[in-house]
Swiss-Prot record:
Subunit structure: Homotetramer.
Gene name of the record: glgC
EC number annotated for this UniProt entry: 2.7.7.27
Protein's UniProt name: Glucose-1-phosphate adenylyltransferase
CC terms in the record's Gene Ontology section: carboxysome
One Pfam family cited in the UniProt record for this chain: LbH_GLGC
Family the UniProt entry places it in: Belongs to the bacterial/plant glucose-1-phosphate adenylyltransferase family.
Keyword Transferase attached: yes
UniProt xrefs under InterPro entries: ADP-Glc_PPase, ADP_Glu_pyroP_CS, GlgC_bac, NTP_transferase_dom, Nucleotide-diphossugar_trans, Trimer_LpxA-like_sf
Keyword ATP-binding: yes
Binding site for alpha-D-glucose 1-phosphate: G162, E177, K178, S209
High-level lineage: Bacteria, Bacillati, Cyanobacteriota, Cyanophyceae, Oscillatoriophycideae
Associated pathway: Glycan biosynthesis; glycogen biosynthesis
Described function: Involved in the biosynthesis of ADP-glucose, a building block required for the elongation reactions to produce glycogen. Catalyzes the reaction between ATP and alpha-D-glucose 1-phosphate (G1P) to produce pyrophosphate and ADP-Glc.
Sample GO molecular function, one term: structural constituent of carboxysome shell
Length: 429
């Protein structure tokens, strides 16, 4: 795998995940209490022995850079690296990244300096565990110019994805972006060609692109340089290249979820608590998911009832009830609180007992969840200060609302409390 260079697409300004992306690049959004989105593709790369990795982001993020430099330091042991490349405006190119392919095009000069055979293009907002060695092996064995990782899907979900058709040898011959009706029916394929059983093939007669590609080095350069107006891999570069290049499909049979929207992100996080066995698990010693070591103390839970939840390290919980929730590092919950179906992202630092006491005396709200509060079906971003007797339950069942000046948004019926927000005592949302 020393001949493979990984390029992780960090996404644009992160509008689909806003307001979680208000103060950070999308790859830096916290996940499952103690990880960040970028940890998923990076861990997959490391477990697959791919150690030359670039991360492309639309704008630079202090928290992303800090996380990567503190977590993924390969110096002294190999020629591996993890480096962030942010969009930049130059005299030759005064524009920001116009799309996924344009992002790679703008930094092609940096990628071409490496002595490698293939580029592995990855997305930064997917939740899955994959050994890229099998994927790249398939690419080499078939002599493909480009190999796409695909997932089999059923008719119900098919119209939400870019679909493709393959011939009897697994070669991609046709594309359709989010087809409906008769056009959808025409995209059915025999997925037994890719290794599914007849029963599985009947259940999932469509194949969708995961947005993960392997390119031969010279093929990617050729496609990007000869087609400067094509800015997106999934919508333009890949469909355009099917005619003249050997495109192969590689079937991925594991769990895979695009978590690039608030609803999908929220549901994928809470699904980690599903019993008896969640579809994705962080408890896998063979293929671990790496993140920064923080050396935090164990969580302290005093007279609490906690069911179907994940609690990260360094939390202080007092006399509260927590159900089907994710608690991030350094979360603090005071007495008589109820937290249900909620993701609390925790805090970046602790407030000392004396500071908390002086804040209370001044009538200010300390960090964490105040006494007697109820939070249901919400995401509370880092360092939020929730006052006493606050109720966050989307009382009026609103689907979408922008209340940024009040410290929250409602997206798809999910209340999202902003990072560093303060919610006053007695507030009802």
């Amino acid at each position: 795998m020393k001949k493979v260079l990984a390029i992780i697409l960090g996404g644009g300004a992160g509008t689909r995940l806003y307001p979680l992306t208000k103060l950070r690049a999308k790859p830096a959004v916290p996940l499952a209490g103690k990880y960040r989105l970028i940890d998923i593709p990076l861990s997959n790369c490391i477990n697959s022995e791919i150690l030359k990795i670039y991360v492309l982001t639309q704008f630079n993020s202090a928290s992303l850079n800090r996380h990567l430099t503190r977590t993924y330091n390969f110096t002294g042991f190999s020629d591996g690296f993890v480096e962030v490349l942010a969009a930049q405006q130059t005299a030759e190119n005064p524009k920001w990244f116009q799309g996924t392919a344009d992002a790679v095009r703008q930094y092609l000069w940096a990628f071409q300096e490496w002595d490698i055979d293939e580029y592995l293009i990855l997305s930064g907002d997917h939740l899955y565990r994959m050994d890229y060695r099998d994927f790249i092996q398939r690419h080499r064995e078939t002599g493909a110019d480009i190999t796409l990782s695909v997932v089999p899907i059923d008719e119900e979900r098919a119209s939400s994805f870019g679909l493709m058709k393959i011939d009897d040898h697994g070669r991609v011959v046709d594309f359709s972006e989010k087809p409906k009706g008769d056009e959808l029916k025409q995209m059915q394929v025999d997925t037994t060609v890719l290794g599914l059983t007849p029963e599985q093939a009947k259940e999932s007669p469509y194949i969708a692109s995961m947005g993960i590609y392997v390119f031969k080095k010279e093929v990617l350069a050729q496609l990007l340089e000869e087609n400067p107006d094509q800015t997106d891999f999934g919508k333009e570069i890949i469909p355009f290249s099917a005619k003249d290049y050997n495109l192969q499909a590689y079937l991925f049979k594991g769990y895979w979820e695009d978590i690039g929207t608030i609803k999908a992100f929220y549901e994928a996080n809470l699904a980690l608590n599903r019993q008896p066995s969640p579809r994705f698990s962080f408890y896998n010693e063979e293929y671990p998911i790496y993140t920064r070591s923080r050396y935090l103390p164990p969580t302290k839970a005093l007279n609490c009832t906690i069911t179907e939840s994940m609690v990260s390290e360094g939390c202080i919980l007092k006399d509260c009830r927590i159900h089907n929730s994710i608690l991030g590092i350094r979360t603090r919950i005071e007495a008589n609180c109820t937290i249900e179906d909620t993701m609390l992202m925790g805090a970046d630092y602790y407030e000392s007992p004396s500071l908390r006491e002086s804040k209370a005396q001044e009538g200010k709200i300390p960090m964490g969840i105040g006494e007697g509060s109820t939070i249901r079906r919400a995401i509370v971003d880092k360092n939020a200060r929730i006052g006493r007797n606050v109720t966050i339950v989307n009382k009026e069942n609103i689907d979408e609302s922008n209340q940024e000046e009040s410290g929250f948004y409602i997206r798809n019926g999910i209340v999202v409390i902003l990072k560093n927000a303060t919610i006053a005592d007695g507030t009802v949302i």
